[in-house]
């Protein structure tokens, strides 16, 4: 009998608990495939975009396209300034690029298994990378081609990509390799930290966007705000933005940016250079044939006439003339070799810059004609925009955007680095070589011996290092700027705070750091176009609000082109022609991937779109399912009509049901605004609706779907929950033993929620529990629950409610950064120095190897490891000579346990131990001041652990775990929490997992009714209320109390991490105020609210203590007369002799210099003569006093004086110097007489 085949893992999930099945999957991970395909699909865009760089399926990869784009570079020998004729020519190009999987370096002779897995890189705090190498091909004077290979450094590899050892591993294999059973991948590991390239929203590719920007007027005289922008994308995913500007005299200029410089060219010159054409052809191309309606449009014909007339001044008519003219102007800009003629440079300019999506490698005449037609269409749309016949395209709408994927951006950086290596580094080292050896030609034996090794060695070949820098900092160092609006903020740390946080990173889409600084809020608005593509709920509050969005959970991103080769033929069969008119009522454009296929009437256009869609869904005639068919109908001043089809990558698509065939169709953001898609089956309008949503929750992100009954809540509360779900102290990972994160939070007593959406199981969130089911009573009890505080049952706390731990990793390295690489220069080693005296307490803490014992409790000041200095003796052995043992100590104030000690070896395996990584566990039981929240944005602080004996109890003997105040609900309108409480109670009584998917209930079929009947069946009150008895008096409460089961989350904001105490400590040198920062022992800030509270309490004198005495109290001399700090100075008494001691302080401003007084009798002088430090003598200025002022005030005074502003203070007269005699009037009444 044949052995039974293993059954494939079932991937279907429902809303039930499924605990046994989940536990089996966890204990015996499947050996065939994942049980949670939806979870793996969430990360697909990241992995697939990286895989596109190095394909192994025979199709050309993105880097193959990039190498073809870089092309062949030419170098000449001899004198640089001499004429190129008669010189030898060296041509060199990249033939291929190879990336190896991660391996131990060849210098390591000890390793048996040479593969390096990601888990090892995390634990060793190093980067997960492979060797990058390039094969070059060169010829001398068109001779035989020769090849050589150069290594380009170590390049970071994306986890689970096609260059990673974990690709296509089953869950069982992943567990064996120390990963999660459901390891997602999609990130890089740099220095042991998981880094992710975030997805960015950019302009839609190959589509002319009509925009109005007031800043366009600043480009020069007669420029207007009108323009057409086209972000044109090459096959290797690099882009070049082309802009057409409308000038007030009817002219149009073509603008582009090259290596961060902008250039403007008349659009007529580009057209004349592309094809051999004449004025009539251009006129008819813009306006239409003589008999068409477009000719009647005088607005258009007048401007086209001006466009043609003003170009006459250049005197360039033929294609050859125009290309040579462009080549002459752009020769230096493009950096082309001297051997190229002006005409060839012009051709190169058109290839590299003008509408590159229509041909950027070996451009044919047909492709040039396509570029010409596209420019005509862009001019036509620009004139329509100016005339008001077409609306402005909104660049902030998802309809006009696409996503720049991490892998594609990574590929763009690799391409640019490869090009820089040839055009900059290699060119410089070759030039340097030729200068040092002026007599050597490319054909000489000396050169053939030195090339390529001696010349390439001087070039900076380490591309891997610059990629690692990009990933670790997120900063882009690029000479071209890669056609992006930002240079930083491209990468984020994929934090595993909890699993929800981790998965959200991969679905995050950012608008770009440039928009974060804008003062306008238009870019942040939630627009209806993003329905089903971007989640309307899941965006942070605060500064990134609306800029950092998350993809809806069903939204997919295309990572490769679909085959649209039959579309052009089908379009012509359906009635598309080549003749067009400027009047959109007569003809509209049919475009595929930014190439004009042809033109047709608006009526034909609609039927072509409907026919293609039917074929597409039915899989007929080779129309791919993921093709986007963006039909824009004609309108009165609306969007420019046409049929815009797209088959290229980086598009968002989402599944909906196509009603005529009842099959799945994928729609894109450009076609959706003009389609009729019903939300539910009941809303389908016969004869109008073409599609219906599979599920109304498809518009929400993964995390927003986890909020139970979110349709019952006020919208901001759902947004808050999306943030708080990501700040929960949950279960970050199951492979905790193989992670060395700087800080990791873990909840020890996690539970599966009773109330949850079916997606909770689909995504396998039960493997990473995020909270606990708590019995919650809504009652105002004891007053400790005011202002969102919550009371916790002390017994629940003792049973482990919310108990968690923090894991911290401390790395101790003895390596000295300045030391060289040879092993002989090791100067420190772990362990005790021989013959040194060691305390008994230290012996208890450390083992004989000088490392801490696992499981030991550490307190502040305890030793965590011992080391001693070493040097090599005459045998090369490392010995200690001074007999002194040095210790590293634990500096944190919190007690911790040593969880794990890792000894980390060197790459080559020959060095003694130099680095250890110690993981510490800090238990964190909930204490007063820790933050908790329900799944409805109802956050609160634990205010008291109330003894169980004093807690209220129900008739069935149930005591609540948590008590919250009823005032938390009315203003916040979180009705979802009431429903969850009912559902959780019913679910707990019947042993059911309750489905909390939103939009399930309506006015006829209410949630209260549904769950109320379940409660009645269990013998409880229909409304969820119960009579409770006071735990203190034992009497029944006057009112019934609402009590049920709610899933509670413990947030990571704990009072132990936040409390701040300070008496005296470091101050800011300039102001004298306490520094800020808890770590540095800084002060606690008293702001305006605190000030108002103290004033309201009638304790205003406390304010003086807080804001002056405890802050920057200082005593300072001041002149009463002129009211200034700045003019006072200490005097020097002239009679003390050589010591010249400082005596009193005088005001220099009010005093008179003795030398400036004429005929003065020293005996008659009224006042004291005093001397300053330089020996000058003065009289007067003694009206000074000491005042108490804040140090910051003196600093402000000096700063303002530097700007020429003088501050004058009035001093209270209470302590003025008394002069004259005292005359008594009445007893006890004193009066001052002058």
Curated annotation (Swiss-Prot):
One of its GO terms (biological process) is transcription elongation by RNA polymerase I. This is DNA-directed RNA polymerase I subunit RPA2. It is found in: Nucleus, Nucleolus. The gene is acr-2. A zinc finger (C4-type) spans 1119-1150. Coiled coil: none annotated. GO terms for cellular component: mitochondrion; RNA polymerase I complex. It comes from Neurospora crassa (strain ATCC 24698 / 74-OR23-1A / CBS 708.71 / DSM 1257 / FGSC 987). DNA-dependent RNA polymerase catalyzes the transcription of DNA into RNA using the four ribonucleoside triphosphates as substrates. Second largest core component of RNA polymerase I which synthesizes ribosomal RNA precursors. Proposed to contribute to the polymerase catalytic activity and forms the polymerase active center together with the largest subunit. Pol I is composed of mobile elements and RPA2 is part of the core element with the central large cleft and probably a clamp element that moves to open and close the cleft.
């Amino acid at each position: 009998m044949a052995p039974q085949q293993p059954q494939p893992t079932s991937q279907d999930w429902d809303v039930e608990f499924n605990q046994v099945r989940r536990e089996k999957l966890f204990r015996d991970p499947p050996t065939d495939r994942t049980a949670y395909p939806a979870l793996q699909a969430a990360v697909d865009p990241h992995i697939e975009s990286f895989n596109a760089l190095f394909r192994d399926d025979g199709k050309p990869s993105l880097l193959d396209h990039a190498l073809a784009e870089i092309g062949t570079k030419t170098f000449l020998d001899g004198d640089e300034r001499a004429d190129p004729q008669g010189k030898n020519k060296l041509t060199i190009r990249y033939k291929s690029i190879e990336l190896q999987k991660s391996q131990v370096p060849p210098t390591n002779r000890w390793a048996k298994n040479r593969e390096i897995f990601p888990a090892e890189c995390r634990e060793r705090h190093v980067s997960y990378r492979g060797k990058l190498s390039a094969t070059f091909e060169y010829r001398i004077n068109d001779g035989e081609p020769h090849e050589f290979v150069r290594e380009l450094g170590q390049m970071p590899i994306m986890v689970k990509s096609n260059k990673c050892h974990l690709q296509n591993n089953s869950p069982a294999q992943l567990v064996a390799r120390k990963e999660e059973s459901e390891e997602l991948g999609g990130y890089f590991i740099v220095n042991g930290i998981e880094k992710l390239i975030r997805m960015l929203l950019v302009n839609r590719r190959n589509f002319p966007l009509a925009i109005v920007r007031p800043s366009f007027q600043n480009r020069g005289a007669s420029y207007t705000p009108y323009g057409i922008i086209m972000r044109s994308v090459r096959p290797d995913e690099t882009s070049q933005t082309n802009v057409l500007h409308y000038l007030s005299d009817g002219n149009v200029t073509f603008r582009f940016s090259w290596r961060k410089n902008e250039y403007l060219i008349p659009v007529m010159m580009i057209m004349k250079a592309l094809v051999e054409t004449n004025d009539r052809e251009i006129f008819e191309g813009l306006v239409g044939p003589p008999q068409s309606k477009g000719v009647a449009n005088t607005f258009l014909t007048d401007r086209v006439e001006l466009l043609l007339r003003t170009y006459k001044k250049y005197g360039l008519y033929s294609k050859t003339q125009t290309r040579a003219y462009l080549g002459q102007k752009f020769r230096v800009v493009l950096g082309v070799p001297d051997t190229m003629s002006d005409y060839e440079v012009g051709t190169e300019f058109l290839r590299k810059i003008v509408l590159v999506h229509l041909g950027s490698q070996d451009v044919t005449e047909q492709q040039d004609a396509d570029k010409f037609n596209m420019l005509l269409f862009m001019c036509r749309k620009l004139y329509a925009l100016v005339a008001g016949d077409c609306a402005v395209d909104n660049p902030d709408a998802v309809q006009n955007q696409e996503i720049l994927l991490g892998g594609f951006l990574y590929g763009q950086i690799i391409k640019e680095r490869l090009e820089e290596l040839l055009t900059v580094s290699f060119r410089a080292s070759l030039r340097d070589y030729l200068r040092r050896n002026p007599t050597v030609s490319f054909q000489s034996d000396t050169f053939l011996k030195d090339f390529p090794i001696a010349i390439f060695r001087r070039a900076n070949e380490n591309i891997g290092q610059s990629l690692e820098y990009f990933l670790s900092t997120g900063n882009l160092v690029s000479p071209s700027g890669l056609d992006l609006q930002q240079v930083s903020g491209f990468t984020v740390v994929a934090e595993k705070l909890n699993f929800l946080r981790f998965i959200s990173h991969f679905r995050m889409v950012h608008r770009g750091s440039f928009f974060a600084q804008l003062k306008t809020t238009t870019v942040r608005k939630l627009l209806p176009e993003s329905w089903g593509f971007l989640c309307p709920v899941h965006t942070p509050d605060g500064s990134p609000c609306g800029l950092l969005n998350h993809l809806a959970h069903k939204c997919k991103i295309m990572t490769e082109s679909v085959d649209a080769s039959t579309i052009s033929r089908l379009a012509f069969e359906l009635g598309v022609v080549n003749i067009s008119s400027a009047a959109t009522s007569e003809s509209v454009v049919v475009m595929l991937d930014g190439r004009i296929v042809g033109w047709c009437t608006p009526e034909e256009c609609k039927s072509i779109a409907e026919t293609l869609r039917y074929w597409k869904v039915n899989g007929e005639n080779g129309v791919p399912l993921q093709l986007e068919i963006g039909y824009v109908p004609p309108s009165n001043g609306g969007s420019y009509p046409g049929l815009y089809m797209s088959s290229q990558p980086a598009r968002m698509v989402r599944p909906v049901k196509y009603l005529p065939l009842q099959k799945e169709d994928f729609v894109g953001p450009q076609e959706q605004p003009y389609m009729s898609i019903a939300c539910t089956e009941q809303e389908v309008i016969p004869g109008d609706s073409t599609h219906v949503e599979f599920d109304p929750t498809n518009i929400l992100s993964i995390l927003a779907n986890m909020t139970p009954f979110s349709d019952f809540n006020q919208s901001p509360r759902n947004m808050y929950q999306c943030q708080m779900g990501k700040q929960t102290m949950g279960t970050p990972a199951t492979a905790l033993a193989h992670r060395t994160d700087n800080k990791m939070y873990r909840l020890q007593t996690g539970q599966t929620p009773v109330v949850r959406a079916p997606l909770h199981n689909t995504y396998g969130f039960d493997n990473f529990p995020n909270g606990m089911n708590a019995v919650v009573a809504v009652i105002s009890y004891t007053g400790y629950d005011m202002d969102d505080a919550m009371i916790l049952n002390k017994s629940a706390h003792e049973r482990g409610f919310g108990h968690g731990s923090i894991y911290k990793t401390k790395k101790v390295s003895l390596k000295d950064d300045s030391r060289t690489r040879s092993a002989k220069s090791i100067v420190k080693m772990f362990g005790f120095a021989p013959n040194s005296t060691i305390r008994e307490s230290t012996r208890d803490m450390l083992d004989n190897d000088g490392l801490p014992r696992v499981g030991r409790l550490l307190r502040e000041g305890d030793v965590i490891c011992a080391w001693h200095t070493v040097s090599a003796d005459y045998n090369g052995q490392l010995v200690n000579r001074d007999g002194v043992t040095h210790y590293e100590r634990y500096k944190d104030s919190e007690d911790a346990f040593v969880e794990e000690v890792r000894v980390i070896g060197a790459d080559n395996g020959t060095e003694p131990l130099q680095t250890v990584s110690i993981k510490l566990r800090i238990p964190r039981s909930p204490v007063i001041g820790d933050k908790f929240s329900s799944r409805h944005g109802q956050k609160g602080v634990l205010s008291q652990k109330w003894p169980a004996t004093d807690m209220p109890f129900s008739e069935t003997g149930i005591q609540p775990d948590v008590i919250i105040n009823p005032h938390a609900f009315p203003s916040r309108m979180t009705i979802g929490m009431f429903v969850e409480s009912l559902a959780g109670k019913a679910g707990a009584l019947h042993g059911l997992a309750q489905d909390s998917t939103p939009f399930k209930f309506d006015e006829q079929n209410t949630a209260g009714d549904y769950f109320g009947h379940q409660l009645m069946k269990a013998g409880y009150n229909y409304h969820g209320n119960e009579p409770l008895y006071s735990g203190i008096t034992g009497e029944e409460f006057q009112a019934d109390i609402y009590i049920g089961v709610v899933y509670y989350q413990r947030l990571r904001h704990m009072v132990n991490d936040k409390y701040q105490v300070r008496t005296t400590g470091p101050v800011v040198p300039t102001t004298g105020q306490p520094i800020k920062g808890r770590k540095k022992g800084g002060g606690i800030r008293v702001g305006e609210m605190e000030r108002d509270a103290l004033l309201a309490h009638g304790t205003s004198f406390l304010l003086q203590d807080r804001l002056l005495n405890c802050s920057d109290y200082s005593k300072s001399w001041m002149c009463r007369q002129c009211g200034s700090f700045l003019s006072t100075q200490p005097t020097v008494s002239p009679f003390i002799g050589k010591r010249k001691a400082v005596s009193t302080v005088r005001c220099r401003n009010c005093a008179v210099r003795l030398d400036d007084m004429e005929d003065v009798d020293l005996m008659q002088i009224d006042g004291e003569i005093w001397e300053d430090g330089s020996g000058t003598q003065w009289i007067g200025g003694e009206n000074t006093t000491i005042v108490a002022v804040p140090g910051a005030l003196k600093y402000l005074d000096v700063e303002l004086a530097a700007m020429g502003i003088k501050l004058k203070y009035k001093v209270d007269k209470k302590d003025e110097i008394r002069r004259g005699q005292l005359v008594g009037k009445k007893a006890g009444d004193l009066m001052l007489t002058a």
